[in-house]
Amino acid sequence: MAGQDSGNLKTVRLWRDAALRARKLRSNLRQLTLSCPGAGGDPLESPDAPQLVLPANIGDIEVLNLGNNGLEDVPEGLGSALGSLRVLVLRRNRFARLPPAVAELGHHLTELDVSHNRLTILGAEVVSALRELRKLNLSHNQLPALPAQLGALAHLEELDVSFNRLAHLPDSFSCLNHLRTLDVDHNQLTAFPQQLLQLAALEELDVSSNRLRGLPEDISALRALKILWLSGAELGTLPRGFCELASLESLMLDNNGLQALPDEFSRLQRLKMLNLSSNLFEEFPAALLPLAGLEELYLSRNQLTSVPSLIAGLGRLLTLWLDNNRIRYLPDSIVELTGLEELVLQGNQIAVLPDNFGQLSRVGLWKIKDNPLIQPPYEVCMKGIPYIAAYQKELAHSQPAVQPRLKLLLMGHKAAGKTLLRHCLTEDKVEGGQGGGDKEKSYLPFPPLGSKGIEVTSWTADASRGLRFIVYDLAGDESYEVIQPFFLSPGALYVLVVNLATYEPRCFPTTVGSFLHRVGARVPHAVVCIVGTHADLCGERELEEKCLDIHRQIALQEKNDAEGLSHLAKVVDEALARDFELRSASPHAAYYGVSDKNLRRRKAHFQYLLNHRLQILSPVLPVSCRDPLQLQRLRDKLLSVAEHREIFPNLHRVLPRSWQVLEELHFQPPQAQRLWLSWWDSARLGLQAGLTEDRLQSALSYLHESGKLLYFEDSPALKEHVFHNLTRLIDILNVFFQRDASLLLHKLLLGTNGEGEGEGESFPTIAVPSPGQDPLRATQLHHYVEGFLLHGLLPAHIIRLLLKPHVQAQQDLQLLLELLEKMGLCYCLNKPKGKPLNGSAAWYKFPCYVQNEVPHAEAWINGTNLAGQSFVAEQLQIEYSFPFTFPPGLFARYSVQINSHVVHRSDGKFQIFAYRGKVPVVVSYRPAKGVLQPDTLSIASHASLPNIWTAWQAITPLVEELNVLLQEWPGLHYTVHILCSKCLKRGSPNPHAFPGELLSQPRPEGVAEIICPKNGSERVNVALVYPPTPTVISPCSKKNVGEKHRNQ
């Protein structure tokens, strides 16, 4: 069912919970719950049935709960000992038929729950005796049929026979005149049971997940029906008689084959909730428009292309789901639905939202991603309705402005030729010789160019149309991998540069394949152009063969990835086709114990990955920077792709003129040269742009979201500052990620001598102190450089020396370090509490520089080695596997993110040892050892079994932090597993892995142990697989620079 629980009016979503609550034992009755010692294990696996003995003097007990005991029979003397019993719970046992002793209770028993057993037959005599029964739950059994005697239960009001094997219902069902609630979902019915048409008192009916294929015309006889579930019933049409169900309030028709509704459907005037998701509607059903009382409407996953303007007539609508259709625009009248609280539009083709959209101010659940939005821009829409309102208000205040500007990223292996290609593309040819100043170098010959890190260039590609590219030259050196993902953003054009002169087919995975996986994981559906450089160094035949090989291997990689994902999606489908009880019966089953909801979420993710493959332009474009014709051909290609509106809608986005002016003012002298501005400095610029203070916030937020500047409104340390000079920030990042000891030492020596302005000089390859310098000081600085490159450690005052050309004051340094922490690049080892940083006191750790493979030995002293605890403690280990690609820099950034959660940490290159309070935790990264092996990242802790909750308490925040980081990679395929504690204790090299989805599910009721499939005789305590409370599966994304800056 589509929708989320929110508010009292979510009727259908709450009906099941309400029914379950109604069936729970009444608190004013005298109750008794009995449990067998050791009961609660898997009832399908345990060989011996437990025995229960009734205590004495229980004659006045009115409610008896014998559930979750693995019983095959009831205790001796049950019938004679309980003369006052009204409610009997026998759920989750092993009964193959109703125990005869239950018949002795028939004259006073009103409620019986025998769900989740092995019933294959009820027994006519026992059923006949239950003449006072009002509620009967037989769900989740193996019943092929029901006895005719069931129809004689004249007082029966609620009956649940869902999740059985019923192919038909007995004729006597028509005699259940008091039946108000009937649940027959997930059975094997092949037609709507005619017997039900006689049940005039029926108010709630669920016949979902049966192959009905049609409904009888006289279904109109069920005039009392208020709630009807027909999900997944293979219905193609509805009879006219259906429209006579005038009492209907909630109707579930999702997952059918409906293409239209009868005109008479509009007679269902009491309808408040309607789910038509996952059908075949191509047009919005006109019969819905007169349903003025409708409060929830779900039309997800259909084929709608438009929404009628008359939808404004549904004035009571609170929830509207229209996601994953083909809707190109919304009617202006939709803004009149001012009571809307949920509006889901993602996965459509909407480019422009109606004016006054901000009137929908009550919308709390808002989903709009995967639409080609240009007005308001995508970044504004993703922030929510208040930001859309501010944008539209500002657009009304000032003239709209369109500024065609596209982000272009040059990626590729080191020495691929990116920097030379950037120069050739962005600079005009000057005939004859070398130009100077603004003049361009000629094509022959080129001096060798090397990258100085990440560089940004503005390129006016077509002055007549004002089309500009912002060109990012991403360094190919591995040391920059941790910051490269920040620049990969939606709406950009990716140019993957390959050196054809050195390319060999065996090098494809490192020079092409890994980059495609990386971009696809970070930016699903991104547009990628493959450019081969140094074409002049290849023969004609060699050039053709290499280009064809790249093309062939790209196609093969895409084919293999898509087939792998399709297979995984099929496995999920097969698991969904099996009953949840069957999946939970055996740990050998795929997706053991995983709920249908989690499986559907998994399937949706696989479908998303399959539907959002990279858009790789072919063929490979060979280019020589010495050939002006080839360069011009590449320019023309890039321009033609950029101007494709369906591929790059953001190129034509419309902004309020005041927002554009504000951006331009930030980059004009004198403020353009500063590293940052205070919020009040930006506010003054806002006034010049015509923005009052209350309208400035939305403008700054948009400029941040779109990557023009950095403004962290959620950060106490940074919210009073605006980082507008991104070029200088990138220069600063380059300083930290040049792993060249000579360059770093040279910068420090310049800094100590006050010669920081020599940044643009050509550095010597070996830093030698000048005669005027103190050799002791030079030695000390060399020691700092060595510590940085080996252990990632730098004190704040040395960082200031490194950044002296950029950092003028202590406040600059403090803000910059706060920014680097927010980016996840470093953390402070000893930040003073309650007072500002003292330059020489604070030390910073850059995890990406740590070289020692494992943490220092002293961290493992005093019994803290997990391996050494195998005989006295149970180990918890959560493992993430990455079959296609491991996000570059993820482990380093993760080690920063968890710093606030841990103490006494010791870092290795691939491992972190630390404590959460007094509980040890270990985070380990294991790179893939071969093409077929995945990269893995695991989080582990240990404790004795009675205290295992402390281990869960230790690792759960770390798991959630990792989940937050992984949200930055929406196209990434990865799996999560809980490793078997017993296997780990045995030292198994290949421990069994329970599905990670169990982390977000509550512990199964009444189950104490789970069998490990790797060793059928070994049982794992349920507390070693399920956390005490479910973890957050999709935590709210934290506002961090890694997510925001990449949207430039």
Swiss-Prot record:
Region of interest (Required for interaction with PPP2R2A), residue spans: 60-645
Any single GO CC term annotated in Swiss-Prot or TrEMBL for this entry: cytoplasm
SUPFAM superfamilies named in the record: L domain-like (SSF52058), P-loop containing nucleoside triphosphate hydrolases (SSF52540), Polo-box domain (SSF82615)
Residue ranges of every copy of the Roc domain listed in the record: 399-645
Factors inducing expression: Up-regulated by lipopolysaccharides (LPS) (at protein level).
Record keyword Ubl conjugation present: yes
Localization, UniProt: Cytoplasm
Keyword match Lipid metabolism: no
N-acetylalanine PTM positions: 2
Stretches for region Required for interaction with PJA2: 60-360
GO molecular function, one term: GTP binding
Processing after translation: Ubiquitinated. Ubiquitination by PJA2 does not lead MFHAS1 to proteasomal degradation but positively regulates its function in polarization of macrophages.
Residue windows of the LRR repeats: 60-81, 84-105, 108-129, 132-153, 155-176, 178-199, 201-222, 224-246, 247-268, 270-292, 293-314, 316-337, 339-360
GO annotation terms (biological process): defense response; erythrocyte differentiation; inflammatory response; innate immune response; intracellular signal transduction; negative regulation of inflammatory response; negative regulation of protein localization to nucleus; negative regulation of toll-like receptor 2 signaling pathway
Keywords for this protein: Acetylation, Cytoplasm, GTP-binding, Immunity, Inflammatory response, Innate immunity, Leucine-rich repeat, Nucleotide-binding, Repeat, Signal transduction inhibitor, Ubl conjugation
InterPro entries: Leu-rich_rpt, Leu-rich_rpt_typical-subtyp, LRR_dom_sf, LRR_domain-containing, P-loop_NTPase, ROC
Oligomer status and interactors: Interacts with RAF1. Interacts with HSPD1. Interacts with PPP2CA; retains PPP2CA into the cytoplasm and excludes it from the nucleus. Interacts with PPP2R2A; the interaction is direct. Interacts with PJA2.
Protein function: Probable GTP-binding protein. Functions in innate immunity and more specifically the inflammatory response as a regulator of the Toll-like receptor TLR2 and TLR4 signaling pathways. Negatively regulates the part of the TLR4 signaling pathway that leads to the activation of the transcription factor AP-1. By retaining the phosphatase complex PP2A into the cytoplasm, prevents the dephosphorylation of the AP-1 subunit JUN which is required for proper activation of the transcription factor. Both inhibits and activates the TLR2-dependent signaling pathway.
PANTHER family: LEUCINE-RICH REPEAT-CONTAINING PROTEIN (PTHR48051:SF54), PTHR48051
Record's protein name: Malignant fibrous histiocytoma-amplified sequence 1 homolog
Species this protein is from: Mus musculus
High-level lineage: Eukaryota, Metazoa, Chordata, Craniata, Vertebrata
Gene (UniProt): Mfhas1
